[in-house]
Amino acid sequence: MAIVVFANFRIHERLIVAGNAAETARNIVAHERLFRIGIACGLIYCTGLVILLTALYVILKPVNRGLASLAAFWRLVYALMWVLMTLNLFEARRLLSGADYLRVFEADRLQTLARLYLGARFDQYYVGLLFYALASTVCSYLWLKSNYLPRALAVFGVISSVFCAACTFVFIIFPDFARVVNLWWFDSPMGIFEMALSFWLLFKGLRPSGIAEADGLSIRQRNPDLR
């Protein structure tokens, strides 16, 4: 998450000027290395998402294999949305590269097309966020069922994830909904849950669970040599 905050607020916000395609293009060309660092941050984040969904699947599979698989799939969709967002950055930079085959287009047209690719990231993010919130809802439910975490933390995860999914879905249909509920509030509660979960797992670890113990007992019963 920290790498995304860095890329968005220290790089993209500095280079991308709202409502000014020409200024945005000049910033990207003048600070190409910084722009490419932002691209690299996106790729690192995508890699982290895949590692995380794999780890969560392994942890939550004993609780309910089907739901754990569904959550992993939805998180994968979210990761793919981030891949598309990163590819859009590449395409925007290519349009501003000054290559010979682009000289048939006017400069302002190329700048507008580049800004279009950058703007498309907004839509892709919120489509991906819907799937991420759905995945988080399922994972939070599995945390609740597993007793791996304190019940209050798992319940907060379910509520915040459902809230994010509902807000995002309504926003996709009714864009003016952002005037009622600020876009920052869509995923902020869920982000707080994710951070609390991370700190809990880092410092406390997983609680012993009857589900995990039963799963281990079942394995030993099937494999007597492991006793």
Model-derived features with residue positions:
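Hydrophobic, aromatic-enriched alpha-helical segments typical of multi-pass transmembrane helices
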Residues: M1-R227
